């Protein structure tokens, strides 16, 4: 395992740790999720380039499309929740409340 792979895995682990520690606000959770997806995208791109497997060349592009969709849906939910509740605290998102 090269130093680049170790750094990308460390970036993924730090984003996951940030998601677990700072999950009180929706915006910080979305930023940590975006960091995780971005590190996975770079890792998938490097792995695809090193493996020379031609059928796997589409995997990073598909991952990038899903990341863009995830970011758009997350920001739309953030705007809707901020307009409805006036805050972006995750604890206010209980579906059992009337």
From Swiss-Prot:
Which InterPro entries does this one have?
Answer: NADH_UbQ_OxRdtase_chain4L/K, NUOK/Mnh_C1-like
**Signal peptide feature range:** none
Name recorded for this polypeptide: NADH-ubiquinone oxidoreductase chain 4L
Reactions catalysed: a ubiquinone + NADH + 5 H(+)(in) = a ubiquinol + NAD(+) + 4 H(+)(out)
Q: Which cellular component terms (GO) are annotated to the entry?
A: mitochondrial inner membrane; respiratory chain complex I
How does the record describe its quaternary structure?
Answer: Core subunit of respiratory chain NADH dehydrogenase (Complex I) which is composed of 45 different subunits.
EC class (word): translocase
What is the membrane topology here? Multi-pass membrane protein
Pfam families xrefs? Oxidored_q2
Annotated Gene Ontology MF terms?
Answer: NADH dehydrogenase (ubiquinone) activity
Transmembrane stretches, start-end = 1-21, 26-46, 59-79
Record-annotated disulphide pairs? none
A Gene Ontology biological process noted in the UniProt record is: ATP synthesis coupled electron transport
The gene designation is MT-ND4L
Keyword entries, A-Z: Electron transport, Membrane, Mitochondrion, Mitochondrion inner membrane, NAD, Respiratory chain, Translocase, Transmembrane, Transmembrane helix, Transport, Ubiquinone
Q: What function does the entry list?
A: Core subunit of the mitochondrial membrane respiratory chain NADH dehydrogenase (Complex I) which catalyzes electron transfer from NADH through the respiratory chain, using ubiquinone as an electron acceptor. Part of the enzyme membrane arm which is embedded in the lipid bilayer and involved in proton translocation.
Cellular localisation = Mitochondrion inner membrane
Q: What is its EC number?
A: 7.1.1.2
By sequence similarity, the record places it as follows:
Belongs to the complex I subunit 4L family.
